[in-house]
């Protein structure tokens, strides 16, 4: 699973899944990557559907899942928007049910396409960009404006498959601020997602990625913050009247 630039620990996803769902319910992750959400679902006796553009990532999930001797969840290789628009395909999987939780860790625009700085330099590692894929449909290859527009579309197309009072969980990480730009991506996304009819922002948690080390970036000439954390944002689908 280390082939992915930003894998999520299955234990973290298991805890989130157990909090928001019951056993045997269904979870969707349409940016599944190397399958942290799917592994978390198997660890908590839930069912999950994962979608990803990369066959390499899906294979890595299946290999890890086999080594852990867990139930293999359903995966679909393809562009998430194309798959979500395929109502027949999703409804065949759900078999007259709905997802109780949609948990996603989207590629943050073209963040991973940028040359590495900071920790990579300190460790004498490659500073080359590490995009998720080279596919033009990959949200990780879009600028922030394009990403935001397409990402909001994915939520709108996935909403019909989520049960009333079901939850969305969205991971996001901010960029370092630049002159004239705060780059508070989590705040930007909260405002945009909260505009979607039928969906309400209900709060967040902050997850610290302990695999990232602290370094005195900029010292002693300037202040550059360490960004070890990601925001886990929670939204709830309204009950239809």
Where are these regions (language model features)?
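Class I S-adenosyl-L-methionine-dependent methyltransferase catalytic core
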Residues: 1-241
